[in-house]
């Protein structure tokens, strides 16, 4: 995908380029050896990592100069996660940033002492038993998580406003990590008087079966696309299928309508990664991770793709358009 190729170039410029340009000397080597070491564990390398590194730079942490960033990417190989998490522990990282439930669960199993900053859209850290409270997480874990019930309610609301006769909705979700999010969507749909149809996926091969099922169930009038790294990767395929099936869609990924989906309402992922860098800064400056509260994103964007709306034969109400943060013509 274009975004991933671009972000890889940016990542190399920010990290690899900085390290390559730094003169090799005993003094520089000594500085690097004494530099704070940040571990970063996530499924894919993308533009969000660039936002994280840029914010580190703003805070005075120059990767390859006075800071070491140890990045581990596990892609679809979940079985590699324990080894990758243990690598970061053995490298004596001062803090580990773990993006996605897979990543921070592996990190928590690997260490109970190194501070972990989690970034996740699919989980409830209290209900999952990872922390005791949002205000005082305790242990070695903190981070950024969504208020799923409120967000899922808004997604149903915006989809229903776009399709006033909406009464049956398909839910495309990752059944490995998305159960909490799916239950929150069920609750929101019940409150809105909408019947849900589950369209679970676990791997890339499941998407066609989910699409076929949605097409066969003629009652479905729209689809809520829940979040997971896998679903984000497949956003263009999902958007293309939805237009062919003439099904309005909404996702919490703002990249989704830019790939051809109808609607998105969700947090700015680059902002979340920038905020993770602020957590890292506070930890490296001596704050106890147990005293750093779990935080919710404060910025949410509504994005509407009018080109897709026209292809679906929909007229988006003016009341919704005026609330949009971005309209794609």
What are these regions (language model features)?
Residues 1-329:
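Short hydrophobic alpha-helices and adjacent helix-cap/hinge residues
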